[in-house]
Amino acid sequence: MHDDVDVSGLPEGITPLGNQIYAIDTMLAGYPGVVSAYLIRTERPCIVEVGTAGSAPVLRDAVIRLGLAPEDLATIVVTHIHLDHAGGTGDMAALFPNAEIVVHERGARHLADPSRLMASAKMVWGDRLETLFGQMHPTEAARIRSVAETGEVDLGAGRKLVSHYAPGHAKHHMGLVDTGTGDLYVGDALGVYNPLTGDLRPATPPPDFDMDACLRTLGLFRDIGAQRLMFSHFGAHDTVTETIDRAEDELRLWVETVRDSRDTGGDLDHAIAMVRDKVVSRYKPLPADASAGTVAVLDTLSGPEANVSGIMHWLDKLAQEQAEAKRKAEEERA
């Protein structure tokens, strides 16, 4: 049942990628080109990333279009629990009754009880929360399997997804390697790739962004030697080494620009303005026919406001840690 898909006439939001893998546009907030989910249609079918609550019916319809019944899905994996990646987990669990839900151990409790996550999101997004993400519903705890530094998902016939803890963007983030293809599912660890322009921007939101952890994760991803990078934002890319190098270069440029602003006494607004002037201005202009909604959502998720806020938060935390270390050293010398 897993090698008989007629790929002719597939809907625009479903893209065959070979090796029984299909990218599915989750249509976040109704807009295309924002979040990619992936169906691995093997003996034990698996979906990587679920998008928001509003994305669950989109994924159900795609799975059925690709010749599977909802009962066939064996596993649902989320790279991390941010709402654009995992907000629909509870809805997906209801639609796919036999699927095990796999998440990093630091995020597992929030899938079972998303009340704290939703309260935090409400503080960040305000009135935009419902429009962008909808409500995250609880997932039955017995169906959740958490993984730590590494873990495995059985895809059948000896093929597996191997998880690797990949913090920096979030403390509950992991990457996933398909042992049958060498594909690496990167979540937000490399940032946001804009298919409209080819630009790659970092994703550095508060409160978890950590530059040092990001760089370690990029090093881990280099060492994996992947054949292809599967972005959650957005799509598959086979220029692996070049793309990881670009991700690091962009990350360093954003952080250095914000640091320069902060070191000269600039506040958040000043840092955002500097990033727009010195960094964002380098990116290619959007095509004239680009969806205004897609552009707005991408800018909301990984634009200067969110990214600079996360970088400033990390720099402030770093300064506090350095000051505390200095104070303790002086006390020891006294």
What residues fall within each predicted segment?
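Metallo-beta-lactamase
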Residues: 2-5, 72-84, 111-164, 215-218
